[in-house]
C-alpha cells in the first residue's frame, strides 16, 4: 500500500502539465489526472507508457472504467490475433461517461472489419461533442482537410495539441504546407510539441526529420535521447544502427571493401578459419562463379574441391556500394583483374571479371551471403569444372 500511495503521488504531480482530454469522466480526481496523461501518451504514439498509466489509474480507482477503454484502444484490432475486441467486450459501459461511451462506440467499429460503420459513428459523435479534444482527436483521420486537419486541431485545442504539432512537423518536412520541405518550420513544430509533452516520440520524430534532411548526426543524437527515455526493449532502438551507420558511412565502406578482399584471399589461400569470420551460420553464402556454371552454396566442403588453377595475381578494384534504406544490407559491385596458369601449362591466362556481393549486418558484424562473378572486357573467368 505504501508503494501504491507513492506511485499515486508521483502520477498526481503530473497534473501540473497533463493535457485535459475528457471533461465528464467518472474517474476520481487522482485517476482522472493519470488518465489524461495516459491519453496524451497514447495520442503521441507512446502506447506502452499509456497502458502502464492506464493500469495505474485503475489501481487508484477501480471504477475508472475509461482506463480499460484506453488499454483496449492500445491493443490491435486484427481479427486473427488482436485483443481489442475481447477487451472491449469486458468493459462495463455503465461506468463510462457520455464522452467515454462515444470513444467506446468508435472503437467497437474498428473491430468489425469491412462491415463497420465507423464514418457514420464518427459524424454522430462529432456533432454531439464538437468541443471535446478527445473526440476531435480520435476522429481526426476522417477529416477531409488533409494535412491542415492537424493545424485546425492545434488552433481549436492548443492545450491538447502536442501530438498535432508532431504531425504538423511531418507536414512541413514532407512539403505538404508549401511547395517544398521546410525543415526549419518542422523543427519549430517539434519544439512546440515538446513544450507541452516531453515524451520520447517527438524525439524520434525529430530524428526522422533530421534524417530526411540528411543530418544523420542530429538524427543519431536525438534517437539516443528517445531510447534513453526507457532503454530496455525500447521501440526506438531499431533506428539507432541506421543513423549510426550513416554517420560512419565512409569508415563502413572502407571496412567492407577490406572485408571483401580478405574473404577472397581466405578462399584463394584455403584458409577456412579466416573465411569463417566473414560468413554466418544463419544464412549460407550462395555463389556464382565466373565460369557461369550453376549457383551453389559455398561451405567448408568447398575448400576441398580440386582445382587446376594456379594464380599469378588476383586484385579487386573500383568498389561501389548500394545500401538498403535501413543500412542493414549492402550490395558491393567491383572488378577483379589478374592472371593464372593451369596445371600442365605455362601459358598465362588473363583474368578479368565484374562482380557483386551482398553483405548483411548481424549481431556479430557484417557477413557476406552472396557473390556473383562474370567475365568482363577482354579477359576470361575461371575455367569450367
Give the positions of each predicted feature.
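Short, low-complexity N-terminal intrinsically disordered segments enriched in polar/charged residues
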Residues: 244-281, 382-385
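A solvent-exposed, acidic/Ser-Thr-rich amphipathic alpha-helical stretch
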Residues: 272-326, 335, 349-351
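Structural motif corresponding to the intra-repeat A-B loop/turn of tetratricopeptide repeats
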Residues: 44, 78, 112-113, 175-180, ...
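Residue-level recognition of tetratricopeptide repeat
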Residues: 30, 63-66, 98, 130-135, ...
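Alpha-helical segment of the N-proximal tetratricopeptide repeat
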Residues: 27-56, 60, 101-114, 138
Amino acid at each position: 500500500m505504501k508503494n501504491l500511495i507513492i506511485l499515486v503521488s508521483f502520477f498526481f504531480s503530473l497534473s501540473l502539465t497533463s493535457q485535459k482530454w475528457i471533461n465528464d469522466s467518472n474517474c476520481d480526481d487522482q485517476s482522472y489526472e493519470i488518465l489524461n496523461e495516459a491519453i496524451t501518451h497514447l495520442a503521441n504514439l507512446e502506447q506502452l507508457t499509456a497502458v502502464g498509466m492506464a493500469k495505474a489509474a485503475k489501481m487508484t480507482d477501480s471504477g475508472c472504467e475509461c482506463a480499460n477503454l484506453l488499454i483496449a484502444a492500445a491493443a490491435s484490432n486484427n481479427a486473427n490475433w488482436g485483443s481489442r475486441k475481447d477487451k472491449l467486450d469486458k468493459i462495463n459501459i455503465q461506468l463510462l461517461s457520455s464522452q467515454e461511451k462515444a470513444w467506446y462506440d468508435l472503437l467497437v467499429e474498428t473491430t468489425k472489419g469491412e462491415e463497420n460503420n465507423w464514418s457514420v459513428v464518427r459524424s454522430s459523435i462529432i456533432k454531439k461533442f464538437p468541443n471535446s479534444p478527445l473526440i476531435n482527436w480520435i476522429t481526426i483521420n476522417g477529416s477531409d482537410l488533409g494535412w491542415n486537419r492537424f493545424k485546425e486541431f492545434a488552433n481549436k485545442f492548443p492545450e491538447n495539441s502536442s501530438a498535432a504539432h508532431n504531425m504538423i512537423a511531418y507536414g512541413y518536412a514532407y512539403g505538404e504546407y508549401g511547395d517544398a520541405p521546410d525543415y526549419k518550420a518542422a523543427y519549430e513544430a517539434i519544439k512546440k510539441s515538446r513544450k507541452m509533452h516531453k515524451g520520447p516520440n517527438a524525439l524520434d520524430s525529430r530524428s526522422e526529420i533530421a534524417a530526411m534532411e540528411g543530418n544523420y548526426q542530429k538524427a543519431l543524437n536525438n534517437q539516443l535521447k528517445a531510447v534513453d527515455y526507457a532503454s530496455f526493449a525500447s521501440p526506438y532502438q531499431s533506428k539507432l544502427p541506421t543513423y549510426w551507420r550513416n554517420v560512419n558511412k565512409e569508415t563502413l565502406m572502407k571496412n567492407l571493401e577490406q572485408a571483401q578482399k580478405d574473404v577472397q584471399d581466405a578462399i584463394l589461400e584455403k584458409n577456412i578459419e579466416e573465411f569463417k569470420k566473414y560468413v554466418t551460420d544463419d544464412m549460407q553464402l550462395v555463389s556464382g562463379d565466373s565460369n557461369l556454371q550453376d549457383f551453389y552454396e559455398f561451405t567448408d566442403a568447398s575448400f576441398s574441391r580440386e582445382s587446376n588453377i594456379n594464380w599469378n595475381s588476383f586484385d579487386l578494384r573500383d568498389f561501389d556500394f548500394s545500401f538498403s534504406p535501413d543500412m542493414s544490407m549492402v550490395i558491393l559491385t567491383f572488378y577483379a583483374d589478374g592472371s593464372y596458369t593451369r596445371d600442365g601449362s605455362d601459358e598465362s591466362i588473363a583474368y578479368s571479371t565484374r562482380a557483386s556481393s551482398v553483405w548483411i549486418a548481424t549481431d556479430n558484424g557484417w557477413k557476406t551471403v552472396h557473390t556473383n562473378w562474370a567475365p568482363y572486357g577482354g579477359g576470361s573467368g575461371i575455367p569450367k569444372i
